[in-house]
């Protein structure tokens, strides 16, 4: 297989040398390469987002029992806090505050994971007993509760939040200004494979594709509609494409640009997959 792209490059050079230009008509080999790339792209598996409605619990009675036990434990802890010495009460109250701050960080991180969506007007400051029971029971899948990857800047901000006292709880505006646009706070849930929530779902019948960006979803939906809005501007060329990167790759056939250079030799290529095939010769 790695001989075919090399033959195609030599043929292109020979045509340009003899005629002075390169024909826009694709060859059978180019059709074959394009088909292989499309098959590799559309047949690869992607992680699917599991909605909360698809999660099945053991029984409603067990869930209700866990909720009652969580409430009783919370009331007992509050009684212990009220009857304990000042030092113990300070430690336990700071522990409860850390739990509440942790739930707050998870809520804020889930809101700021997608920069294209607006933030909700309210923020949840108190820990939810039902949410704690569901998380501790282990019935939720890791794809439902997902948080963005951590960054050094946000870790410093989260340490500042954890360092303040129970009475110095920051306002919603301060929390949003410090965390909006940064995907970094760690929540209680497990992180998804790419670190962000997949919120853009394809609504065509039988399609279960989910994307993190709306632009990627629009490009995917063109495979269902057959729309090709990107047209080649080269004179005499009528080719159209559904994605802008495909148009850019096609336009290099007219200009002869080869931006992909081999790091082991002086060979240059117009496509990254051709360079990858060539790099196998140096292994």
From Swiss-Prot:
Tissues/organs with expression: Highly expressed in placenta.
Ranges annotated as biased composition (Basic and acidic residues): 183-196
Gene3D superfamilies noted in UniProt: Classic Zinc Finger (3.30.160.60)
InterPro entries, alphabetized: Znf_C2H2_sf, Znf_C2H2_type
CDD domains, sorted: KLF6_N (cd21586)
Keyword Translocase: no
Origin: domain of life: Eukaryota
Low complexity bias (residue ranges): 104-113, 133-148
MF (Gene Ontology): DNA binding; zinc ion binding
Motif (9aaTAD): 62-70
Cellular localization per UniProt: Nucleus
Pfam family name, one: zf-C2H2
Keywords: Activator, DNA-binding, Metal-binding, Nucleus, Repeat, Transcription, Transcription regulation, Zinc, Zinc-finger
GO (cellular component) term, any one: nucleus
Zn finger (C2H2-type) location: 200-224, 230-254, 260-282
Location of region: Disordered: 104-198
Biological processes, Gene Ontology terms: cytokine-mediated signaling pathway; positive regulation of connective tissue replacement
Main location: nucleus
Subunit structure as annotated in this protein's UniProt entry: Interacts with ZZEF1.
Record text about domains: The acidic N-terminal part may favor interaction with the basic domain of transcription factors.
Family: Belongs to the krueppel C2H2-type zinc-finger protein family.
PANTHER family named among the record's database cross-references: KRUEPPEL-LIKE FACTOR 6, KRUEPPEL-LIKE TRANSCRIPTION FACTOR
Function: Transcriptional activator. Binds a GC box motif. Could play a role in B-cell growth and development.
Protein name: Krueppel-like factor 6
Native source species: Mus musculus (Mouse)
Encoding gene, per UniProt annotation: Klf6
């Amino acid at each position: 297989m790695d001989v075919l792209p090399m033959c195609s490059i030599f043929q292109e050079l020979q045509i340009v040398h003899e005629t002075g230009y390169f024909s826009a008509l694709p060859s059978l080999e180019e059709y074959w390469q394009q088909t292989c790339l499309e098959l590799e792209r559309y047949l690869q598996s992607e992680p699917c987002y599991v909605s909360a409605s698809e999660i099945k619990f053991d029984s409603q009675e067990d869930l209700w029992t866990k909720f009652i036990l969580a409430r009783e434990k919370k009331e007992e802890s509050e009684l212990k806090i009220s009857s304990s010495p000042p030092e113990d009460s300070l430690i336990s109250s700071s522990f409860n505050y850390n739990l509440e701050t942790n739930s707050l960080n998870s809520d804020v991180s889930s809101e700021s994971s997608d920069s294209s969506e607006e933030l909700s007007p309210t923020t949840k400051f108190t820990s939810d007993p039902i949410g704690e029971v569901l998380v501790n029971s282990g019935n939720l899948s890791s794809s439902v509760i997902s948080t963005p990857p951590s960054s050094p800047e946000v870790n410093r901000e989260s340490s500042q939040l954890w360092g303040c006292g129970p009475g110095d709880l920051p306002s919603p505006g301060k929390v949003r200004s410090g965390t909006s646009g940064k995907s970094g706070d760690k929540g209680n849930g497990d992180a998804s494979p790419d670190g962000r929530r997949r919120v853009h779902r394809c609504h065509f019948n039988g399609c279960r594709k989910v994307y993190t960006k709306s632009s990627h979803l629009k490009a995917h939906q063109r495979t269902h509609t057959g729309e090709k809005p990107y047209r080649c501007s080269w004179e005499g060329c009528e080719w159209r494409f559904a994605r802008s990167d495909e148009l850019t790759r096609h336009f290099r056939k007219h200009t002869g640009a080869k931006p992909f250079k081999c790091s082991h030799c002086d060979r240059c290529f117009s496509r990254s997959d051709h360079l990858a095939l060539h790099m196998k010769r140096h292994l």
